[in-house]
Amino acid sequence: MMKRETLIEAGIIGGLAGAQVIYAGNSELLSQLLSLGIDPLLIVILCTFASVLLITPLAFLLERKLWPRSLSFKLKIKLVLVALAGVTLFQGLFLEGMKHTSASMATAMPNLCPAFIFVIAWAAGMEKVKLSCMYSRVKMGGTVLCVMGALIMSLMHSTTATLSSVKTIPIVPDEVVVDKDKILGCLYLLLAICGLSSSIVLQASILAEFPAPISMFSMVSLMGGITTVALQYALKGSMEMGSASVIGLGHLVGYAILGGLVSGGGLSFNAWVIKRKGPVIVSLFSPIATVVCVVVSAFTMEESFNLGSFAGMALMFGGLYFVLWAKGKEDCEEIDEMKQDDEESLLRTEFDLQKPLLL
């Protein structure tokens, strides 16, 4: 029994690390596709519908008994909002931001999610904050560090890219050249992470009423794909392939299936791990994708990073772990308090003064 549990623990750790490496490779491939001029919304549409086709049979086999007989109107509204924020808004802005920056920057930004989720949940009244509690203060400090690190990394990364591309222009020491396109890309990424964080908070509310994460992902992906198609028609009036002919429709469909497998499989595995071990351990592995992307970009794309970029990245990772550490400690403290309250309630019931003592 102990050996089986050890193997499961090792499988979880190896699976989480492997998922981040695959995610990093997928991000690098995405960056290459975007550099060819392929429309980001087209990639979102193809990958989303591919995910629906691949994940729906799995949801039917594993979670059919968990489906409710009917969905309430409130639950339907939440599902639509998650589809808009987590699929159309997040993926569209994320790919647009990656197009203007790099895969390394795009994989670094999602590390802001725990801090943003904390702020959104606090504003919505779902997260308790006591200024007298040390863990609450650590979470607030970690959130500030995350945001500061993201801003520093964005500014330094945009400056580095510009200076390395204008070697013939003499650089004045007191003047800093900033690539406005990179700054715009970072803003797209920040907005994308805000959308993702909002959708995660909503998902927690949905799963309390609809405890089938794979089925929820399938439904949200379908609705998100439909809304993205509607957005494509609203913005461009048609489903134009753009520069997709450069690589061929067959290769693009093949990537869509690969992207659907990566996103659908990764999210399903994360949902299983969260159910067994909680969300904290999943978040702890998220910086691996950023590190892999930085290394791959440095060797394959000759992308330069200065000390300021790494300092901002380190600051953001530090803030992330502060938030996760405080959240984990706070959850443990709440569990201990609940156990203590249960024990006190049991004692009061057992030694009720209105009951005669046993002789």
From Swiss-Prot:
Pfam families: EamA. One of its GO terms (molecular function) is transmembrane transporter activity. Residues 30-154, 206-324 form the EamA domain. Disulfide bonds: none annotated. InterPro entries: EamA_dom, WAT1-related. It comes from the Eukaryota. It is a multi-pass membrane protein. One of its GO terms (cellular component) is membrane. It is found in: Membrane. The chain crosses the membrane at residues 5-25, 41-61, 77-97, 105-125, 143-163, 183-203, 206-226, 246-266, 279-299, 305-325. Keywords: Membrane, Repeat, Transmembrane, Transmembrane helix. Belongs to the drug/metabolite transporter (DMT) superfamily. Plant drug/metabolite exporter (P-DME) (TC 2.A.7.4) family. PANTHER family: WAT1-RELATED PROTEIN. This is WAT1-related protein At4g16620. It comes from Arabidopsis thaliana.
